[in-house]
């Protein structure tokens, strides 16, 4: 029996060579594009992502001038968090954002979840420098997490549109909003940065960046990160990662070419999912059996001790391994005074494994695998895309046309490896040298996305009124091929030739404005472990090949007002969203048990809510930021499952808190800075019938820092202390609603993650 080999990202792949050749080619045509110094200055084009990164301090954090609800994170916001914190966690201070994780810095991907206005992470759009990151799910099939895509310090700007994303966003999953990240540009002068973070759970993180400075329009930086920590619970379960980022900019005239490269390797001990029953019987800190191998063997053989009641209460150990390489080549060219071309080509390669000891005997046909084999889920992604936009400034109109095309080839397979004569693995779980015992499943997918859009932005009444008229055409074809385990083959297409988006903003005066927007969108059918075809061919044939399955769609309308003064800024927005043909996974087993989940169309979901934000800056020393959101998301229909009807009409959507509140107080004086952050999240349900829920909670974090300024040859030296979960609150953080069920009467559904205890981190940073 053979196993398909998915290689780790190569050190210098052919794709990177092609991108570098393309970069040189673009540089060679610069003399033919560069504007004549003697001609009049051209009309200023809209700020590009990189330009926005350079001028974030001048951009409204409440989205002043936008026709949609938009919120931004500033560099001051980021400083309230420890170095190395996931950029997603920083977003939790914004209205409508629910971010959860099981570790203090939000880095462990198995426990990461984010939702906006009742839309889970699978139904949002994410980009880095305009390039799609897929849906950032744990078992990703079309992208990668932002933590693997870029080192946190190299992010210059983060923007959240919680309900209606920009029409040109390169995403085929953004039914409920977008999150856009922008990488920082190389600095104009030579500099070197180094920081070292030490903290709870043996955390050690080193960050380094060197900027070349700008020479004749050419500038660059190279940056690296090394992270090493133990999971906060369990026995010496490491969470390690290494990353390298590099960026090159070449500016000539009013034109720019940039190349961004990222390589990352993550080896993480997963945090196990628990149930209400496990927490009650075995405690908040329950984890893997590691290093007690005899207890794991006994449990697999039905001999239970210390409150354990089933083999599924724990496994011996589990890990996730991910290797990624991302390359982005972008060019922005002023073709004439009124015509701007922006073009991007990118490539992403991922190879990954999720390895876990399997505490059950596996039997399939004539194959029997003894308990405590290693269950290995193997992932592979190879995607390439091209996107471009052409913007024409015609009087009071800004007309933009753009397209995006992406080819995404991804694989998912699951194997069992026999550990009968092997030494138990107490740290990172790997399958090297172990005999392959069974192929549980093997599938490959080929997804092709094509998207075209047209936008007209019209300003009038002395620029007080701005109108936007947009429309896009999108189609994604997903083809599955079953290779092993009896898994299915088939094809689905999601297509809509006309998805409109309209919006308006009106300036009442220099401080106040009102805005409104309406949008329709459609999501592609997912691939990999989230695909309707991720089951046996027999099950697919019983559903007539899913020929009647409809893609998920949404219609959103929002209305709001903003005020921005020197003393304070405030915004308020109300919204209504109808989400049709919502597809949910129905778990047929719990925990790590191998089985096929079902897919149900639960009809429509209606989401209504209110979002408020208020920021007060009484003087240069104090800043008080607040956000509040109320959301009411319910299922509009019952659904059929297993020949019966599940009564969910009127029930609250899983993992959707009705009320969230965030308050952040920041102080700085001379060389000192300090901050206190508080977050509240109300009760959340984790079953479709709402028979089971987790309680709401308050969390507090704090930070303190000192800037020594110039010390000898060092331009700047800083030290900071960050406290996470200041009052050591016990709470349920992540709900793995990918494995939700209709009900959980016995409390045995293993989809709960407990939150991290109080943690502390100290960072020393220097700049040359």
Regions found by a protein language model. Name each.
Residues 39-188, 559:
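Acidic, small-polar-rich N-terminal luminal/periplasmic segments of exported/outer-membrane proteins
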Residues 37-39, 396, 461-462, 569, ...:
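Gram-negative outer-membrane beta-barrel transporters
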Residues 139-141, 153-157, 162, 166-245, ...:
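Outer-membrane beta-barrel translocator/receptor signature
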Residues 249-251, 256-328, 355-374, 423-433, ...:
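Acidic/polar loop-and-plug regions of large Gram-negative outer-membrane beta-barrel proteins
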Residues 6-8, 19-22, 505, 516, ...:
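Conserved C-terminal beta-signal and adjacent last beta-strands/turns
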Residues 322-355, 370-485, 507, 564, ...:
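Face-selective signature of the C-terminal outer-membrane beta-barrel domain
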Residues 330-334, 340-346, 352-356, 507, ...:
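Membrane-embedded beta-barrel scaffold of Gram-negative outer-membrane proteins
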Residues 381, 393-396, 404-406, 441-579, ...:
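Structural signature of Gram-negative outer-membrane beta-barrels, strongest in the C-terminal barrel
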